[in-house]
Amino acid sequence: MSSTKSDFEIIREYIIGDGKDISVGKAPEGNVRLEITHSVLTGESLGTNNFKNFSLDLKIKDFKEKLYRFVGTEPKYMELILRDENKVNDICKIDDDDDKTLGSYEPKDGMNVHIIDKDPNNFVSELQDISKAPKPVISEEDYNKREGTYKKWKEENQLKKENDTTATTVTATTTTTNNATDTEIEIKVGDRCKVISDDPTNYDERLGKVQYVGTVEFSSGVWIGVELDLPLGKNDGSVKGKQYFQCSPKYGCFAKPKNVLVGDYPEEEI
């Protein structure tokens, strides 16, 4: 019996992707998209997105500095191995000639750079095991009396979101494309923004620019079309053959207004 996808699954695939490896996306011209792994740090420690874009003209000494900011291993203690996308075959060792460029090693999108930490004083692996660390114990009643806690912040933030939604005064038909019904929002085309997840445990966020605000054919209500800074999207501004805005493949995504935060965000780079 053939299985069919629900409307929710279809919409989810168009908005946030269909679960494929994000290394499939191509880096912008003149860049390469590489997966970063570490001999000590686990994948959980590095985060869910350890694929990063790098300029092919980047000198190795500058490449190491960027890796240092990502993993915390000092450049002088790094040994870098370029591996295939399956992380099985070593292609070459990235030597210590800091004036060479990353492009001179001919890396391809999806390949892996594995960092071997040679620091003799490294104790990061011990820090990753928190099972034996002492944990403070406090009753829920005492915790609720405290100010400045995460719980208080979350409650205040949620209340602020609800108030902002209620108090919005800009009509969509005056600030959006294609008649976004009478829903009132404050997001307009050209705004810099951050796309966030509904999942409170998912801290991934994507930066970009609003390119479309309005109704869509694939779902009800108002949707925000965003051109992302990095190829972490699903589409090119079109869904099911309908073009809502123009952008490169994998740079487009759609989100509900509540998942789009407008602000003076700088263009995203590693």
Curated annotation (Swiss-Prot):
PANTHER family: DYNACTIN 1-RELATED MICROTUBULE-BINDING, TUBULIN-FOLDING COFACTOR B. GO terms for biological process: cytoplasmic microtubule organization; post-chaperonin tubulin folding pathway; tubulin complex assembly. Residues 214-256 form the CAP-Gly domain. Supercomplex made of cofactors A to E. Cofactors A and D function by capturing and stabilizing tubulin in a quasi-native conformation. Cofactor E binds to the cofactor D-tubulin complex; interaction with cofactor C then causes the release of tubulin polypeptides that are committed to the native state. Belongs to the TBCB family. It comes from the Eukaryota. InterPro entries: CAP-Gly_dom_sf, CAP-Gly_domain, TBCB_Ubl, Ubiquitin-like_dom, Ubiquitin-like_domsf. GO terms for molecular function: alpha-tubulin binding; microtubule plus-end binding. This is Tubulin-specific chaperone B. One of its GO terms (cellular component) is nucleus. Pfam families: CAP_GLY, Ubiquitin_2. It is found in: Cytoplasm; Cytoplasm, Cytoskeleton. Keywords: Chaperone, Cytoplasm, Cytoskeleton, Microtubule. Binds to alpha-tubulin folding intermediates after their interaction with cytosolic chaperonin in the pathway leading from newly synthesized tubulin to properly folded heterodimer. PROSITE patterns: CAP_GLY_1, CAP_GLY_2.
